Amino acid sequence: MSKHHPDLVLCRRQPGITVGKLCERCDEKCPICDSHVRPTTLVRICDECAFGSSQDRCIICGAPGVSDCYYCSECTRMEYDRDGCPRVINLGSSRTDWFYERKKFKNAGKEMPGATY
């Protein structure tokens, strides 16, 4: 995910023992490169990201988590699985801009064009 969206900020704290979760939409994606091939290493997240309201949530988009998250074999080979907690902290500029555009359209009484997330 961070390869394709450079404005996303990842947590990168020391990972704990909690396994990261993914939602149905993000299922079987590597959290670093978004590939769907050869899941290898289980993703561990830090204790702060695994506590409170973010518990059992998708580490990429924040939706309710369904399945465990895995790094792909290429990210494991490049040792990206040792860089720290891969949970996305901010939304990124494109989703933030979309939120305010949607709010502007609702206040004007119009329907928002395009896909709804």
Swiss-Prot record:
Gene Ontology cellular component list: cytosol; nucleus; precatalytic spliceosome; U2 snRNP
Keywords, ordered alphabetically: mRNA processing, mRNA splicing, Nucleus, Spliceosome
Gene Ontology terms describing biological process: mRNA cis splicing, via spliceosome; mRNA splicing, via spliceosome
Family membership: Belongs to the PHF5 family.
InterPro entries xrefs: PHF5
KW Transmembrane (keyword) present: no
Function: Required for pre-mRNA splicing.
Places the protein is found: Nucleus
Protein name: Pre-mRNA-splicing factor ini1
Main subcellular location: nucleus
